């Protein structure tokens, strides 16, 4: 199973590009899947998922009550902002301004591996998120 593990710091350059950490790039390349980004529903961050996870998510939406407003809101919240990312030869992709505003990222960022996906957060928010998460298990 391919997984996104560990945490890495990075920056957004003047052209709004971020370089994906090499181990994450390797996971994406080895998966041979498309890669998608969207606004997290849990935190002020961006989530990056492979197409297999997105397909699984869409399938789960389709298996739920079609007329459920809750299901419809969930689909809208995720799928209306979902975007495929294009990774260049240097392993970078562009983070659109609307995603930067939502996640409060500007220059320094952190990539946090979550197994089947990874999150991109503003560095200080990400460091704090990791600290809070660890404290929950003491």
Regions found by a protein language model. Give the residues of each.
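Flexible "stalk/tail and boundary" regions
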Residues: 1-10, 14-17, 23-85, 89-90, ...
């Amino acid at each position: 199973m391919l997984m996104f593990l560990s945490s890495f710091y990075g920056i957004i350059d003047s052209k709004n590009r971020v370089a994906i950490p090499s181990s994450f790039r390797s996971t994406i390349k080895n998966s041979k899947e498309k890669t998608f980004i969207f606004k997290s529903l849990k935190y002020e961050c961006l989530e990056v998922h492979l197409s297999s996870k997105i397909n699984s998510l869409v399938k789960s939406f389709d298996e739920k009550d079609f007329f459920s407003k809750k299901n419809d809101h969930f689909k809208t919240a995720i799928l209306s902002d979902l975007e495929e990312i294009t990774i260049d030869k240097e392993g970078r992709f562009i983070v659109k301004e609307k995603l930067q505003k939502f996640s409060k990222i500007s220059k320094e960022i952190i990539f946090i591996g979550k197994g089947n996906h990874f999150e991109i957060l503003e560095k200080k928010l990400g460091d704090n998120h990791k600290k809070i998460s660890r404290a929950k298990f003491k």
